[in-house]
């Protein structure tokens, strides 16, 4: 566990996009827990969003729990702010279907964050039937716990439970 976290920290210090992606690809099979997965947010990736998006879409199609979780985490960290955001990313994440707890929780976390940053676009996904019910309810719960979601928005979200 500690060795993998150290390896992840070294990857995060990478200053070159190509070498960072290469090291990340080699490291993916060793990610076996949520903590190691969620710490991986190399800053260099934020300067190469179009290229990174291709990788993210590949990773979203993976059968591996933590590769899918990493892809959603990258979408949450790098693509929900106004400069990089596009509505289609919400649809991509909503389409992720998994029985894996750590994937479902990341989808919920993504949508809770989307409700804080892109409320109007994320809100329709909180309607019943737009995603797996358990995940939808978790997303609402996490949004209600967030300090970044306004009291008015929280009041409406409560009515959707």
Segments and roles (model prediction):
Residues 1-161:
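Alpha-helical scaffold domains
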């Amino acid at each position: 566990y500690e060795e993998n976290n150290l390896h992840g920290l070294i990857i995060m210090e990478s200053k070159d996009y190509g070498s960072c992606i290469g090291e990340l690809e080699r490291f993916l099979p060793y990610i076996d827990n949520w903590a190691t997965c969620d710490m991986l947010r190399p800053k260099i990736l934020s300067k190469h969003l179009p290229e990174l998006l291709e990788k993210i879409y590949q990773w979203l199609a993976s059968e591996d729990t933590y590769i899918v979780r990493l892809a959603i985490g990258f979408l949450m960290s790098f693509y929900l702010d106004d400069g990089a955001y596009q509505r289609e990313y919400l649809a991509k994440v909503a389409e992720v279907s998994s029985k894996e707890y750590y994937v479902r929780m990341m989808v919920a976390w993504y949508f809770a964050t989307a409700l804080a940053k892109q409320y109007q676009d994320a809100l329709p996904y909180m309607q019943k039937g737009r995603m797996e019910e358990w995940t939808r309810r978790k997303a609402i719960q996490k949004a209600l716990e967030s300090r970044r979601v306004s009291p008015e928005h929280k009041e409406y979200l409560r009515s959707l439970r």
